[in-house]
Structure formats: C-alpha cells, structure tokens
C-alpha cells in the first residue's frame, strides 16, 4: 500500500505544494514501531497525519469507515522468573519453583482488570517453564499484555500486573525480570479532518463513506503518531479500509482482498491532494 501511495503522489507531484511525507509504520502488529518513528522527530512539523487499517465489510465490498475509535491503550511485556532447581522427590524443599511463581502471577494479573472508568483487559498468552517432570522448575517465562480504554486505565492495570508479579516472585523465593515489548496509547481522530476525508471519498471515489461509529476493540500504535501531531498543533485521523476477508483476525486461515491496497492508496493520495494541493 505504501509503495503504491508513494508512486501515486510522485505522479501528481506538480499539483502539490509544501511537503508530503509517506511514513512506513514498522512492527504494527506488535505495537512496537510507531513510537520510535515519533521519537525521530519526523512528525514534529506535520500539519495533518492520516493512517488506516484494513477491516472486514459485511458484504465484502470496498469501503471507507471514517468514524473510528475505541483504540485501547496497551503494554506488551515478557516476564522471566528465576528460582532454583532441585529433585522433585528427594529434595523438593531445596528448590524455588519458578513455574508456580509464574502461575500465581498469571492468576493475580487476570483478576485485576475491573475499572469503573472504562474497559480493562489483561491476557497471558504464553507460559513456558521447566525441564522435566521430576525437576523443580528453575525458570519460567510468560508473555502478557494489559489494555485499557484510556491510557490512564491501562497504566493502572499494568501497575496492578507488576504488583502481582512481584508478590508471586516473593512468595516462591524467585527473582524476576520484566522486558517491555511494545505499547500503544489511546487517541481520538479530529472531527474537522474526518469531514475533509469524507468529502474526498465522495468527490474522488464517487461513493458514500461509512460514518457509523466503529470501535476497534484492540490496540493500534498509530495512536502515538496521532498524539504527536496533535500535541504540535496538527490534526490526525485513523480510518478503517473495508474489504472482503477469509478467516478471522489472527487465525491461521486469514487472508484479505488485495484490491483494497490500490483502493487505499487512491484515498491517501486524494487526501494529500486535497490538503496540500496547489490553489493557483
């Protein structure tokens, strides 16, 4: 999509003024890339930033969903517990069970997501430990995430998770190390920019955009780019780009209609022309 967009912009370069930046968002699936893009400073002088994500439409047609939201702030992290191995039958008292520490931490984290201010989520998606059935496990690793409908809620749930990890490690005499693997903030698109994009869709594609509210229910680190531009006085917007889809998200049979790539590039190029086109 980004290559097609760049080529389209190059072909209409004489009609543009100012500076148009085409930014690749790396490691989006793990919400690991956008923050580093923001820290580079490339967005500090940007007046408008647009991003999108493919989504499924009910009839499989190409569509633009402009009224998007529900981006959950999130933290992704790995935890390694270290204990001490010993013989499970002959000298279990000499061991420090890292598997039990990780299991207790998992149970504790999963029960601390309630928040009256909004939505909270926690998931431990992977737990590995041990070397054999007759060995007290000396090491355990879990991969987890916390989420919240606002950055504040997400931060509190993450803090509760860290408390659970620390307490579980102490209970079983283990040490632990937390490695942050990614994250995203919550954000809101600017209404004025959304209206511009909707008119571009009508004028350039000859179709009516889907303006019904669509909440993501997941996380998207493009929100860091949105916030960076907004904090510098600019406008930001994220949209869903509808197409047909096979298999559910994160399913091994997942696939999508690739015609959405050209469709999306036309939208982005048309928006750039509307926002940065020459007026004389």
Q: Residues of each region from the PLM?
A:
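Histidine/acidic-residue-rich, glycine-tolerant segments that coordinate divalent metal ions
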Residues: 1-5, 9-126, 131-137
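Metal-dependent amide/peptide-bond hydrolase catalytic core
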Residues: 99-280
């Amino acid at each position: 999509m980004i290559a097609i967009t760049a080529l389209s912009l190059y072909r209409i370069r004489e009609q543009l003024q100012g500076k148009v930046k085409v930014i690749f968002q790396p490691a989006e699936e793990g919400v690991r890339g956008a923050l580093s893009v923001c820290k580079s400073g490339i967005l500090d002088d940007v007046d408008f930033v647009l991003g999108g994500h493919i989504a499924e439409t009910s009839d499989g047609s190409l569509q633009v969903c402009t009224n998007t939201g529900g981006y959950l702030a999130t933290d992704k992290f790995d935890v390694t517990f270290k204990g001490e191995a010993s013989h499970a039958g002959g000298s279990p008292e000499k061991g420090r069970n890292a598997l039990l520490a990780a299991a207790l931490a998992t149970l504790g984290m999963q029960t601390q997501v309630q928040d009256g201010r909004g939505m909270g989520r926690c998931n431990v998606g992977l737990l590995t430990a041990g070397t054999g059935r007759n060995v007290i496990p000396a090491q355990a690793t879990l991969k987890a995430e916390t989420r919240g409908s606002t950055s504040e809620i997400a931060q509190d749930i993450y803090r509760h998770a860290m408390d659970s990890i620390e307490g579980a490690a102490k209970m079983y005499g283990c040490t632990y190390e937390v490695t942050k693997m990614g994250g995203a903030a919550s954000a809101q698109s600017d209404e004025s920019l959304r209206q511009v994009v909707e008119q571009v869709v009508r004028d350039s594609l000859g179709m009516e955009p889907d303006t019904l509210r669509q909440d993501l229910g997941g996380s998207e680190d493009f929100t860091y780019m949105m916030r960076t531009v907004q904090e510098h006085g600019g406008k930001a917007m994220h949209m869903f780009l509808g197409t047909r889809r096979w298999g559910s998200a994160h399913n091994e049979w997942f696939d999508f209609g690739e015609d959405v790539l050209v469709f999306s590039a036309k939208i982005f190029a048309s928006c750039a022309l509307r926002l940065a086109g020459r007026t004389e």
